[in-house]
C-alpha cells in the first residue's frame, strides 16, 4: 500500500487513516478534487472532507463534495432512502457554510448515469470515506481501476484507524489488549480544525443533474422523488425519527447531559427506552463523529461513561476491524472452527418449527417476546442491544441450517434496522452463531456448544407490559380506520401493508367475494377465473389464496359499491348506493381511472374520464366434461386468449378473451348478442363439447390501462391499481402501486404533523 502521507503531505491524524485504492501517485490535472461521501454524511470532524479541503488548498484546485443516493445498495427501501434524504439536507447546509460546492445525485427513473465513472476521467483526485462492506468496497475498487487520478479511501468511522490496525481478533479482550496503546493515544485527542480559505468553485460540467435540496425539504416533492426510485416501498420510514447531522448532534448532547450518567445501570433494560443513547443509526451513517463522542464521553470520567466507551471502542471497533480484515465478511467460514464443528454436529437435530420468510419478517413465530422484537424492527427500525442478542439466537431453531440461519438473521436486520448493513450488524449476527465467543458445555440440541440465550429467561426479567407498549406505539394516533375501496390485488396488498404497521384498516368491495377481477368464481356449473389481468399460470391458479392471505385479519365488507366521497379537514366520508356511510381517516381508491371522477365529485382531472384502456369481451363456457385441448389450441385474429377456467387439467370451464379491437367494435352490444358473435368466431373448431355447454358474456370495459395518469396531490385520498405503476395492466403493476399507495397515504398524514428534530435510535450489537 502506498504511503499517502509522503505523496500528499497530509497531517498525521489524516494520513494514518488513508489507504490508496490505486497506484497513481501524482495530482496532475486541473479537474476538481472530488470528495465522494457514502457513509460519513457530516461536515464536522470528517477526515475525508478535511483531506479534500487540504488537497484543494495545497494544489489550488476546485473542491466538490458529491453524495449519491443509489438504488443498488442491499435492501434499498423507502426507510433507508428517507434517512439519506435527511442527511443530504444537513450535508448541503454544512458545505454551504464552509463555502464548499456540494452536489447530490439521486438515482431514479431517467437519472441513472455512471457518475463516478465520469468523475474518474476528469477529477484531479478522488477522496472517499472507507466503508469495508460489499457492494461499497467493490464500487470503490472499480472506480480506482479505471481512474486516471489518485483514489484515496479514508477511515471516518473508528478512533483506532482501520489502516493502522485492521486485524481480526478472535475475542474482544484480545482486541482490547492489542489496541490498548493505539487507543490510549487517540481517545482524548481534540480534532484539529482547519483554518483555510474557501476552495475554488468548480464551474465545469457535471455528468448528472444535481437535485435541488429544496425538493427534499418539501415533503410533497420528496415523496415524488422517492416514487421515481426503483426501491422497496413496503418498508416505511420511521416517522418519529429524523436523520442528518444536526439531529444527531442534538441527540448526543442530550444523552451526554442527561443519559450517560445512568448508562451502566439502565443499559440492559429494553423496556427503558431512554436508558441507551439510541445513536447507532447516526453513527452508522456517519452523521456524527465517533471521535467527538469518544472524546467528550472520556471527559465525563465516570464508571458509567467508561462502560459507554467500552461499547464504542471495544465491541464496536472490534467488529469494524474484523470486517475490514475479511474479504467475504458475510460467510459462515468466518466463524471459529469449534463453532463450525458444533453446527455440523447438530445439523440433523430436529427443528420442531420451521418458519417461512414472511413469518420471520412479520413476527409470526411461536414466541411472544421474539415477535415483539421483530415488530420493533419492522415498525420502528430499531431493536435494543440486549434483546438483539436474544432475538438473533432464536433463528437457528426455526431454520434448516447454519447458512439459512445466518442469511435470515442478516436479512431481517439489514432490511429493517436503520443501523443495518454495518460491520457491527455482521459481527452481531455472527456472534449469535459463535463468533468472538467460546464453547459452552454441555452441548444442547440445535445450538450445540454455541452460547444459548433463552427467550423465556429473558422474558422473565423484562417488564413485558412496558416493552409491549413501547413496541406497539404508533407515531400517528388514528381516530378512524383507513378505508381501501377494492379488494383485488392492489387493495389487498395496500391493506396488508397498513395492517402490518399496526393501523386499523377496512376494505370495501362491490363484489360478492374479495378478489376483484382476479377472484375465482365458484358456481354450481364450474369453477373459473375470468379476469383479464395479465396473469401468469401460477398467478391465475393462486390468485384467491394470495388475496385472501393478504386480507387475513382485516375487516372486508363486500357487495358495497361506493358512489361518492366527500373530504373534510381531518377525515373522509364515503357513501354507497344504498345511502350507507363510512368515516375514514384516509382512503385508497383502486377503481379504474374513468370511474374516479363521479365518485370524487369532479375534483380530479377532466381527462381521467377518457383515460385510455384496453377493453375485452369475455365468453365463459361451462361444459359437462373437461375442456378438450383442441379448443385451447385454437387461434384467431379476433381472439386474444383461450384458456381453461382454472389451471387444472380437469377444468370444465372455457374462457375466451376477445381482442381489444374486436371488443371496442362491439362494446355497447348486449350480452346475448356478444355470445352469438363470439360463438360464430369459434365455429371452425367444430367440437361436440359446445353442444351441452352454457354460455355467459362479460364486458371488461376497463380491462387494462394503456397509459399511466398524472398523480394528483390530495392529503387524505390516494390511488392504486394496475394503471398506477409499471408494468401497466399486470398483477406486478397492481402490487407495486399498492406498496407506494400505502406509503403515500401514511406519508401525507404523518408529515402533515411537525417532524421531530432529533434522531432516536438504539445501540448496535
Where do the protein language model's features map onto the residues?
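Beta-rich, aromatic/charged-enriched effector core domains that present basic-aromatic interfaces
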Residues: 101-233, 429-432
Amino acid at each position: 500500500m502506498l504511503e499517502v502521507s509522503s505523496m500528499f503531505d497530509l497531517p498525521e491524524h489524516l494520513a494514518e487513516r488513508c489507504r490508496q485504492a490505486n497506484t497513481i501517485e501524482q495530482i496532475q490535472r486541473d479537474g476538481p478534487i472530488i470528495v465522494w461521501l457514502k457513509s460519513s454524511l457530516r461536515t464536522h470532524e470528517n477526515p475525508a472532507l478535511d483531506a479534500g479541503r487540504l488537497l484543494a488548498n495545497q494544489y489550488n484546485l476546485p473542491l466538490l463534495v458529491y453524495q449519491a443516493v443509489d438504488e443498488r445498495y442491499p435492501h434499498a427501501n423507502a426507510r433507508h432512502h428517507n434517512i439519506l434524504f435527511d442527511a443530504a439536507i444537513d450535508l448541503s447546509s454544512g458545505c454551504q457554510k464552509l463555502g464548499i460546492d456540494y452536489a447530490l445525485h439521486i438515482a431514479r427513473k431517467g437519472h441513472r448515469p455512471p457518475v463516478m465513472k465520469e468523475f474518474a476521467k476528469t477529477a484531479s483526485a478522488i477522496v472517499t470515506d472507507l466503508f469495508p462492506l460489499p457492494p461499497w468496497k467493490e464500487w470503490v475498487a472499480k472506480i480506482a481501476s479505471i481512474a486516471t487520478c489518485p483514489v484515496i479511501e479514508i477511515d471516518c468511522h473508528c478512533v483506532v484507524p482501520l489502516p493502522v490496525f485492521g486485524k481480526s481478533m478472535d475475542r474482544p479482550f484480545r482486541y482490547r489488549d492489542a489496541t490498548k496503546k493505539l487507543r490510549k493515544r487517540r481517545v482524548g485527542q481534540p480534532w484539529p480544525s482547519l483554518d483555510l480559505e474557501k476552495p475554488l468553485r468548480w464551474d465545469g460540467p457535471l455528468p448528472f443533474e444535481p437535485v435541488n435540496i429544496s425538493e427534499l425539504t418539501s415533503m410533497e416533492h420528496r415523496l415524488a422523488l422517492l416514487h421515481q426510485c426503483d426501491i422497496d416501498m413496503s418498508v416505511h420510514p420511521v416517522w418519529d425519527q429524523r436523520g442528518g447531522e444536526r439531529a444527531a448532534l442534538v441527540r448526543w448532547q442530550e444523552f451526554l447531559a442527561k443519559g450517560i450518567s445512568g448508562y451502566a445501570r439502565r443499559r440492559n433494560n429494553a423496556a427503558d427506552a431512554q436508558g441507551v443513547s439510541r445513536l447507532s443509526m447516526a453513527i452508522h451513517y456517519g452523521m456524527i463523529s465517533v471521535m467527538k463522542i469518544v472524546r467528550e464521553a472520556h471527559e465525563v470520567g465516570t464508571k458509567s461513561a467508561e462502560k459507554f466507551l467500552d461499547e464504542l471502542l471495544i465491541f464496536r471497533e472490534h467488529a469494524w476491524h474484523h470486517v475490514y480484515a475479511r474479504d467475504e465478511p458475510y460467510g459462515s467460514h468466518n466463524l471459529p472452527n469449534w463453532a463450525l464443528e458444533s453446527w455440523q454436529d447438530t445439523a440433523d437435530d430436529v427443528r420442531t418449527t420451521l418458519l417461512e420468510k414472511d413469518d420471520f419478517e412479520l413476527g409470526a413465530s411461536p414466541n411472544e417476546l421474539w415477535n415483539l422484537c421483530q415488530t420493533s424492527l419492522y415498525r420502528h427500525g430499531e431493536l435494543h442491544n440486549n434483546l438483539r442478542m436474544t432475538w438473533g439466537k432464536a433463528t437457528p431453531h426455526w431454520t434448516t441450517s447454519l447458512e439459512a440461519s445466518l442469511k435470515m438473521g442478516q436479512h431481517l436486520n439489514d432490511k429493517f434496522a436503520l443501523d443495518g448493513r454495518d460491520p457491527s450488524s455482521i459481527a452481531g449476527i455472527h456472534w449469535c452463531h459463535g463468533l468472538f465467543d467460546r464453547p459452552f458445555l454441555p452441548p444442547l440440541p440445535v445450538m450445540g456448544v454455541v452460547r444459548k440465550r433463552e427467550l423465556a429467561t429473558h422474558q422473565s426479567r423484562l417488564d413485558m407490559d412496558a416493552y409491549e407498549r413501547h413496541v406497539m406505539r404508533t407515531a400517528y394516533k388514528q381516530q378512524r380506520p383507513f378505508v381501501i375501496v377494492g379488494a383485488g390485488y392492489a387493495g389487498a396488498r395496500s391493506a396488508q401493508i397498513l395492517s402490518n404497521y399496526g393501523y386499523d384498516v377496512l376494505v370495501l368491495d362491490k363484489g360478492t367475494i374479495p378478489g376483484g377481477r382476479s377472484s375465482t368464481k365458484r358456481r354450481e356449473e364450474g369453477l373459473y377465473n375470468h379476469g383479464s389481468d395479465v396473469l401468469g399460470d401460477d398467478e391465475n391458479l393462486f390468485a384467491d389464496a394470495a388475496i385472501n392471505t393478504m386480507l387475513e385479519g382485516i375487516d372486508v365488507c363486500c357487495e358495497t359499491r361506493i358512489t361518492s366521497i366527500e373530504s373534510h379537514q381531518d377525515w373522509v366520508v364515503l357513501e354507497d348506493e344504498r345511502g350507507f356511510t363510512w368515516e375514514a381517516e384516509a382512503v385508497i381508491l383502486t377503481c379504474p381511472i374513468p370511474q374516479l371522477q363521479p365518485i370524487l365529485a369532479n375534483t380530479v382531472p377532466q381527462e381521467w374520464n377518457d383515460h385510455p384502456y384496453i377493453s375485452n369481451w369475455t365468453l365463459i363456457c361451462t361444459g359437462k366434461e373437461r375442456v378438450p385441448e383442441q379448443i385451447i389450441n385454437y387461434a384467431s385474429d379476433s381472439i386474444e386468449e383461450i384458456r381453461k377456467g382454472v389451471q387444472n387439467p380437469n377444468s370444465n370451464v372455457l374462457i375466451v378473451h376477445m381482442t381489444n379491437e374486436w371488443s371496442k367494435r362491439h362494446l355497447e352490444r348486449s350480452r346475448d348478442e356478444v355470445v352469438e358473435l363470439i360463438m360464430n368466431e369459434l365455429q371452425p373448431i367444430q367440437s361436440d363439447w359446445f353442444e351441452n355447454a352454457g354460455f355467459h358474456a362479460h364486458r371488461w370495459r376497463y380491462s387494462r390501462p394503456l397509459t399511466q395518469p398524472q398523480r394528483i396531490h390530495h392529503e387524505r385520498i390516494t390511488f392504486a391499481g394496475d394503471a398506477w405503476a409499471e408494468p401497466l395492466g399486470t398483477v406486478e403493476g397492481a402490487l407495486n402501486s399498492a406498496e407506494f399507495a400505502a406509503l403515500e397515504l401514511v406519508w401525507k398524514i404523518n408529515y402533515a404533523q411537525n417532524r421531530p428534530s432529533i434522531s432516536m435510535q438504539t445501540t448496535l450489537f
